[in-house]
Amino acid sequence: MKTAHYLAALLALTFSTASLTALADDMTPYGDAKVDMHKYPKINRVYDVNYDDPKKLNALVNFIKNVNKVVPGKAVVVLHGTEIRAFAKENYEKYQAVIDQLADLRKEGVDFRMCNNAMHGAGFEAKDIDGFVTIVPAGFAEVISLQNKGYKVIDATATAVKDSRYIDHPEKKPQS
């Protein structure tokens, strides 16, 4: 008799665990997310970029491309951090992949402006910087000036979300 109770309890536990796992995979108490893929109006925007590492420019490229896909309007990138060294001609070989992508964005209409103060502070002159960039008197003042002209300021903090799902659940990542 004890064996029958033990087997019944074991079966119940097995099925309840399987049911809970299926429930966790398929449902939460909140249901499914709503989808609202509406159109955005024309919005002129300025990306305020002040990175401590030029490698973060890779995330900026994707960020701008994704916003440009869904938001019509003009886009300006104001550079005033240490990322500016990536735009120096002497560093082209080191940063070529991202600089070429940014130059392609320029061809698509994205305007790149660099702070004169930051450029000089980093030890560069205008002649040292790639030709698709415009040097402006001051980065913060440029952002404020564009804001006064109706541009919306976008904090271009470089945070990539690609594959972030797998931080908590690495077992769900598809194998290559």
Model feature map: region roles:
Residues M1-A8:
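Bacterial N-terminal signal peptides that target proteins for export
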Residues A22-S176:
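Secreted/extracellular ectodomain signature
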